[in-house]
Amino acid sequence: MHTGQRDMIRIRVSKEAFNAGFRAKHFGEVLYAQVKNEFEAVVDKCQVKIYTNPEDCTKIRHEIAIPVFDKRDERLSTMTDESVPVYYSCIMCQAFSPSHVCVVTPERLGLCGAVSWLDAKATHQLDPNGPCQVITKEKVIDERIGEYEDVNEAVRKLSQGALDDVSLYSIMEKPMTSCGCFECICGIEPFSNGVCIANREYAGMTPLGMTFSELASMTGGGVQTPGFMGHGKHFIASKKFMKAEGGVARIVWMPKELKEQVAEKLNETAKELYGIDNFTDMIGDETIAEDPETLVAFLTEKGHPALGMDPMM
């Protein structure tokens, strides 16, 4: 099995598979076959090269892969949900979460982090009958939470009737469902009137009293869980992140590594929306607090805006 995306994938190979003869070269053979199968409309030939030397992998990651990722993200950063005529659905994960449907917009990528609006558009163009379908956005029900009649109809159909309605910008009102592939999980932290975010790589405790794995067990499965949602890392700095509840100003805690990864863009968003400089300095992490009492004391000292916002519950 594998989880994650881009340069953060994790692949597990069972001892049984290894004992049966599975080796690194077989990854290449599988990739080769899948690329030819998935992209047969545009790919005639392909070559797979596997690097196992950590130094080579690190060099290639920084010199080739990350610049490509950054270029894609830069293109997306110029787009907004309002600037495009359609959104896209993604049901790639329905094999193990039958009722889950991702609604992918320019400002909210798929919760796995691997499917942006541009990716979903390309997927649909390559395979019009595939996992990514066009969703119109003409009939607005509630602009505040990002609810559309068109989106509800699509989700109802694609979830086989398991879901009736969904919002794009709220964690409390009709939140989008999660499968199990999410990069991050966001959960309400009532003592601080904000939310904590944990990423898949973080194995420690959160101020919510749960680890990532424990949060995942109650958030996934294609069921709406108000107060909790799975999402991609890039959604954290989005102006649409929990827009209905006040936006990124609700973020009170996340692991230090994740905070460093999103700091630049999150600080830019907070500055633009609220006029706050260096917002991430106000956000707690595991080196500061792993319990709500210590976290609230830190937030009070920093003057975190969430403490003065309307109650979420």
Predicted features along the sequence, with ranges:
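Cysteine-centered metal-binding/redox modules
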Residues: M1-M313
